[in-house]
Amino acid sequence: EEFLGRAISHRRSEYFLASKCGHYVESSENDKKGNSWGESDLRDKEWTKKTLIESVDRSLRRMKTDYLDLIQLHSCDLDILQEGEVIDTIERMKEAGKVRFIGYSGDNEAAEWASLDSRFDSIQTSFSLLDQGAKDMVFPGVNKTQKGLIAKRPIANGAWGADKSPSTYASEYFRRYEIIKSNGIDVDIDLSPIELSLAFALSHQNINVHIVGTANLSHLKSNIKQIETEQLLDEKTLLQLYEVYDRSNDNWVSQT
């Protein structure tokens, strides 16, 4: 956030600026040490009005702006969502002009519930050819309530087609890929594994934003080219990828 503040605060009108709240907030003792995160026992992780306000105010301060276009409750459990205080608190900040839109970022039952709640303007949830649960659990509510839909991890962290897990973060996706591969993948298409992964996500046109992170400029250019050329999958290929996922699925849940 501090990086963004330095880079774009003077060009604020050019950007749709989104952030999340509900993650760890540093204590005053931690701040004095000059440590951005500190030890876990110095973190306040309660879903309270106080910590939510502090989290949003911190984002505004760090990004050198007086409002966020989108604030997202990040991985808030279903029972906390249903209590209502967290949403009420964010709504008060919206009324105060600190945020324009309210979103939920998470997965599974909590995302399904949030997808049907009219107070949320958008849902950010995991979706890829190795994480298809949101298609049946979250997409219907988003479509019904006409929310914005943001797909995180849309290329499954590069696990599809990999020889080994690309990272610890991708280990569950790689495990799923190994199972799917052992069950037989009958997809005849002239795309690299990453291109196939991105094409699968892009072929779901109810998704408004795909979060495809990279630190490699050539990868970024390749992704942009694929989007510009509208390199999508036909219905037959999509159905094949749905089928092999469903056939391999052993109660898989969406990964946060």
Model-predicted regions and their roles:
Residues 1-23:
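N-terminal binding-site loop/beta-alpha segment at the start of enzyme catalytic domains
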Residues 30-128, 203:
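Glycine/proline-rich, positively charged
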